[in-house]
């Protein structure tokens, strides 16, 4: 794991921070060393008592096929099992800053910063998709092309359960996490004036790009099933998550997108998450410190 690409490590840590509960790979490795055969047997026995099964049919299957499958797994359901649980993710809170730090044996550094909206639902998710669409080229051009900070310079929408946010990330051979954080801040302020100057035509072009991505014909069964699986995990029996998100993108306004940027990225309107992977070359330069 320590030799894995720095940006991959940072993104993996980011995904772990969005889950409840979560552990990084080091904690799992340490816990594994203490596992005994008796302990494993006790865990398996407890798991079987609470074993739950959810059967969901999708594609070329009939109702009879699904019911037959349900009957076949019914004997394995644990005596203490309740209803299937919904997927659990963190709930962003206004003004909270989370800071994950880790030294790396590799020379490069990586910084990933996320801004998570405490308002959940399709409207928030739509605004984040549109905001990322407006910022992706600008972030890459500034930090990768102009400042040449690293191999990877990217923005990305953050989608978790019913929540959403926006993230920025760089892997760099020329700056530690503190230096990268300074360049991120410089970009954030510059981007505000750029967002305020976005034309209606550019915004509509970004909107149509997002809508095209959401409504395109799936290339694989797995791609088509992904949206249904998300609804299933969240207990959305209407299975209309994609339709609701598409409708929210269609009605979102440029003013709403700019305001959410001002509130979340430049203000303390949500939860701010830093993932810092400090390369060995920059260990003496210190960490980014954001309050």
Language model features by range: what are they?
Residues 13-16, 25, 29-35, 39-73, ...:
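C-terminal regions of mature proteins
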Residues 25-31, 52-59, 117-120, 125-130, ...:
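Second-shell loop/turn segments in exported
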Residues 63-68, 121-125, 175-182, 283-285:
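Short, conserved charged micro-motifs
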Residues 10, 15, 80-138:
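His/Glu-based metal-binding/catalytic segments typifying zinc-dependent metallopeptidases
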Residues 40, 55, 113, 129, ...:
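Buried hydrophobic packing residues in well-ordered domains
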Residues 134, 138, 142, 158-218:
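M16/insulysin-pitrilysin zinc metalloprotease superfamily fold
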Residues 69-83:
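Glycine-centered hinge/linker elements that transmit conformational signals in sensory
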Residues 98-113, 144-166, 175-184:
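A glycine-rich, aromatic-flanked flexible loop/lid motif
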